């Protein structure tokens, strides 16, 4: 887990306002929402699976960088005082025996099924999109107001306990002349996936068709652009599926938890 640095007082109203909207039932992808505030993926597991996942994350830090872990039975996080992890994400997924059972904007009922749930908040690449935009690099899914495309690769994660699975990556088309800049900017945020894991040649990592992402929405790739791939916090959901985890709650891909922590806190 990454220790936060230079924490100070700042206006967290944009993050709180977004969470309040989601608590009231608004559903939307969170890319570009509350810019400047760190966003997080989430996976929630019964206590008897929590150590397996913590070890899985430790062994696969590029895809699963842990930002916070709750106490068993708690729906709170130190990353946003007063937030409720059961209601404050725009959309949740409920998993049973490794299969997606439902999507819901409120996970309170599912949460009540297990009194000892442990929540993990995982770094999200949306965090470094703001500095990329500020550097003049277009983020296509933000321009098109769609969800980021995410793909299941053929790259195995290192297993841990009962958990195994392949890495999931997110993709952003980047002009060939700006790929190095995108890698440099994102590389300054190792706690939220950091630099890309692959550039170009999607077939080399098992992606057959960029127009058919397993998660999220396809995006345009214009002439002169290169598909650039980052490790993605949906990787835990791939492990849930591959490992047949009996019960889990996760964020829906692209629908993150918005923290009160500034992006700059995770700048290396």
Curated annotation (Swiss-Prot):
Which enzyme class? Answer: lyase
Give a single Pfam family match.
Answer: D-Glu_cyclase
List the keywords (alphabetical).
Lyase
Alphabetized Gene3D superfamilies for the sequence: PSTPO5379-like, PSTPO5379-like domain
* Superkingdom of source: Bacteria
Q: Which InterPro entries match?
A: D-Glu_cyclase (IPR009906), Putative_hydro-lyase (IPR038021), UPF0317 (IPR016938)
Q: Which GO terms describe its molecular function?
A: lyase activity
E.C. code? 4.2.1.-
Q: What is stated as this protein's family in its record?
A: Belongs to the D-glutamate cyclase family.
HAMAP family, per this entry?
Hydro_lyase
> What is this protein's record name?
Putative hydro-lyase Avi_5849
**To which species is this protein native?**
Allorhizobium ampelinum (strain ATCC BAA-846 / DSM 112012 / S4) (Agrobacterium vitis (strain S4))
The organism's lineage is: Bacteria, Pseudomonadati, Pseudomonadota, Alphaproteobacteria, Hyphomicrobiales
């Amino acid at each position: 887990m990454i220790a936060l640095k230079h924490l100070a007082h700042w206006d967290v109203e944009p993050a709180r306002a977004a969470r309040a909207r989601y608590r009231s039932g608004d559903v939307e992808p969170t890319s570009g929402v509350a810019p400047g505030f760190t966003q997080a993926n989430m996976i929630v597991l019964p206590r008897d699976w929590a150590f397996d996942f913590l070890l899985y994350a430790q062994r696969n830090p590029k895809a699963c960088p842990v930002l916070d872990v709750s106490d068993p039975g708690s729906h709170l996080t130190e990353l946003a005082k007063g937030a409720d992890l059961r209601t404050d994400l725009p959309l949740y997924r409920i998993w049973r025996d490794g299969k997606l059972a439902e999507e819901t904007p409120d996970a309170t009922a599912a949460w009540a099924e297990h009194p000892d749930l442990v929540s993990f908040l995982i770094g999200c690449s949306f965090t470094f999109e703001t500095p990329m935009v500020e550097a003049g690099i277009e983020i296509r899914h933000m321009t098109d107001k769609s969800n980021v495309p995410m793909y299941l690769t053929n790259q195995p994660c290192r297993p841990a306990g009962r958990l195994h699975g392949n890495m999931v990556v997110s993709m952003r088309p980047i002009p060939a002349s700006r790929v190095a800049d995108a890698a440099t900017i994102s590389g300054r945020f190792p706690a939220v996936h950091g630099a890309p894991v692959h550039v170009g040649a999607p077939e080399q990592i098992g992606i057959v068709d960029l127009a058919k992402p397993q998660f999220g929405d396809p995006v345009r790739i214009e002439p002169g652009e290169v598909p650039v791939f980052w490790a993605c916090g949906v990787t835990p959901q791939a492990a849930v599926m591959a490992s047949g985890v009996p019960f889990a709650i996760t964020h829906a891909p692209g629908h993150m938890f918005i923290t009160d922590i500034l992006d700059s806190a995770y700048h290396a």
